[in-house]
Amino acid sequence: MSPDDLSRLMPFLVLASALCLFALISIVLRLALIERSWPAIGRFVTARGVKAHVIEQGSGPEVLMVHGAASNGRELISALGHRLTDMRLIAPDRPGLGYSGRPKNAATLGEQAAFIADILRQTASGPVVAVGHSWGSGVILRLALDHPELVKALVLLAPASHPWQKSASWLNRIAGWPILGDLLVWTLPPLVGPKLAPKGIARGFAPGPVNPPDYGDKIGTPLFFRPKAYKANAEDMVIGSAEMGKQAVRYSSLTLPVTIVSGQGDVIVYNAIHAAGLKRDIPHATSFRVPEAGHMPHWVDPDLVEGIIRAHATDTVYEGSSAQFRAEP
């Protein structure tokens, strides 16, 4: 390239450099604002050699709450915490999400269950009622399989539990690549994610409206768009189906009380694969289907979920308080 060619290109190179610098500054400021707006509100313990962020509330019967994908420990405690004030709630951020660190091999359900087990050994005095939403259901199922002494009952909300056919999205696959993956997680999620979040939240609540309307702010959805959280979630998604398949063959060995709560209109996790699969593999499980709910049955009717948790905490059986919440056969 001749000096003349270089001089002609120089304005474009300067402009491109300025735009890249502006984008970088914008991303750093956005990430700082997210963490100022939704700071860590729990305490930190060490689990599997890394820091684990755990939100705790109250005293009484102990209830573990494990959130799903693209989320954090605020989700379940925001839905149910004000109802369960006479119980001790333990709501960790799963590995790499929220404010928890991510140990090696953390995408495997066995490692995530071991991470939760380490937390429980430091925060719980005995076996807990374990509540899991979506992906969190797969984690607490593995917890019950690998660490049965820590769990007295399972409450599975819109559970992800079995292998499925659809492959991981291209964004999730690329996020794990060297260099290009890092470039992706540092640009697209922080810049574009907050604009797309309302559509994703609406899909989770469909067929009903988003309720509460400020759901994203209440649970700190923007925390997911930080690079480390997005990358961690992507890693989970890429091997998730295979991981669920490995443990699904063991479900029939579970003997503890299990309750499944699914939404009739769930378009995120298909009931025919997961809720029905659990009922087939764990015949003694009790299963409830909420007619007007999608992927968020604990928000659509928290009365049902509260009743189930209280029943398990007191070793009784919840049979439903309303005709619309009939137990499935």
Language model segments and positions:
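Alpha/beta-hydrolase fold catalytic core
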Residues: 1-61, 85-87, 126, 314-329
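Active-site loop/oxyanion-hole signature of alpha/beta-hydrolase fold enzymes
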Residues: 55-57, 91-131, 135, 167, ...
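Catalytic active-site module of serine/aspartate enzymes centered on a nucleophile-bearing elbow/loop
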Residues: 283-329
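Conserved HGGG/HGGXW glycine-rich cap/lid loop of the alpha/beta-hydrolase fold
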Residues: 56-99
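Acidic catalytic loop of the alpha/beta-hydrolase fold
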Residues: 265-269
